[in-house]
Design a protein with these regions (language model features):
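Short, flexible hinge/linker loops that cap or flank conserved catalytic cores
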Residues: 1-3, 26, 85
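Glycine-rich FAD pyrophosphate-binding loop
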Residues: 25-47
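Dinucleotide-binding Rossmann-like beta1-alpha1 core, especially the glycine-rich loop
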Residues: 51-107
């Protein structure tokens, strides 16, 4: 049954929309609806085209912790026993000495 009203309506079931709904319900909100234009995992937004890359190395300790928490959350999500997130790796290449020093600070 489709609801015709809700306290919170989130447009888009991408990472931002789903995360917003997740945390609102975790905080006790019960009247939250997520609206998506197409079938889940086949949506037209940027999340469905993203490779699953989350950089956990950052010069900012807060952003590094946020990335780690994101990976922990994404890793825990599943749909009927199937994972919803497939992590991939990445590499950053320093082409200059300044960039090398910047990368060293991030580690």
């Amino acid at each position: 049954m489709i609801q015709d009203k809700a306290m919170v309506v989130i447009i888009g079931a991408g990472i931002v929309g789903c995360t917003t709904a997740y945390y609102l319900t975790k905080m006790g909100w019960r009247d939250v609806v997520v609206v998506e234009q197409g079938p889940l995992f086949e949506t037209g937004g940027s999340t469905s085209h993203a490779p699953g890359l989350v950089f956990q190395v950052n010069a900012s300790k807060i952003l590094a912790e946020f990335a780690k928490d994101s990976v922990d959350l994404y890793s825990s999500l599943d749909l009927d026993g199937q994972p919803c997130w497939y992590p991939v790796g990445g590499i950053e290449v320093a082409w200059t000495q300044d960039r090398l020093e910047d990368l060293k600070r991030k580690v």
